[in-house]
């Protein structure tokens, strides 16, 4: 049997990149945030609704309050690279989960190379990256669904090593 590093089924890749922009209120501000995400990703964003009513914050149940977009493939890698350049290719160890995912936030969307528009304003956003190995589709498919083995799961250490090798990033 070949070494684990040479095995094609052991390669780690980006499954998806989710960019979330939570405004906290519906209306014109949320529409502007959706426009920013559409310009960034080239895809139509989806609105998220509040789960509960919180009177002290002025949030009603089912009120639109955030917008997010899911990006896959090469476009996800390009946008992730732009986001990591804003963070100077440095992430904290806390940013990595035990299941092989990581996330980080940026304060201003104009740092990604987008042009500033005074009528739109400035929005911060969260980047969430889901990593996977080939063969994880067996857990998501509709017919003959089965479990992914523990050897095929991505650990926190493997995720950090992948980040360091792919993006030459630092983890502190």
From Swiss-Prot:
GO molecular function terms attached to this record: rRNA binding; structural constituent of ribosome
Keyword Metal-binding: no
Compartments (UniProt record): Nucleus; Cytoplasm
InterPro entries per UniProt: Ribosomal_uL5, Ribosomal_uL5_C, Ribosomal_uL5_CS, Ribosomal_uL5_dom_sf, Ribosomal_uL5_N
One Gene Ontology cellular component: cytoplasm
Chief localisation class: nucleus
Gene Ontology biological process terms from the UniProt entry: translation
Keywords from the UniProt entry: Cytoplasm, Nucleus, Ribonucleoprotein, Ribosomal protein, RNA-binding, rRNA-binding
Family matches, as Pfam families: Ribosomal_L5 (PF00281), Ribosomal_L5_C (PF00673)
Source organism superkingdom: Eukaryota
Assembly with partners or alone: Component of the large ribosomal subunit.
Annotated family: Belongs to the universal ribosomal protein uL5 family.
Job of this protein: Component of the ribosome, a large ribonucleoprotein complex responsible for the synthesis of proteins in the cell. The small ribosomal subunit (SSU) binds messenger RNAs (mRNAs) and translates the encoded message by selecting cognate aminoacyl-transfer RNA (tRNA) molecules. The large subunit (LSU) contains the ribosomal catalytic site termed the peptidyl transferase center (PTC), which catalyzes the formation of peptide bonds, thereby polymerizing the amino acids delivered by tRNAs into a polypeptide chain.
Identification of the protein by name: Large ribosomal subunit protein uL5
Record organism: Tetrahymena thermophila
Lineage: Eukaryota, Sar, Alveolata, Ciliophora, Intramacronucleata
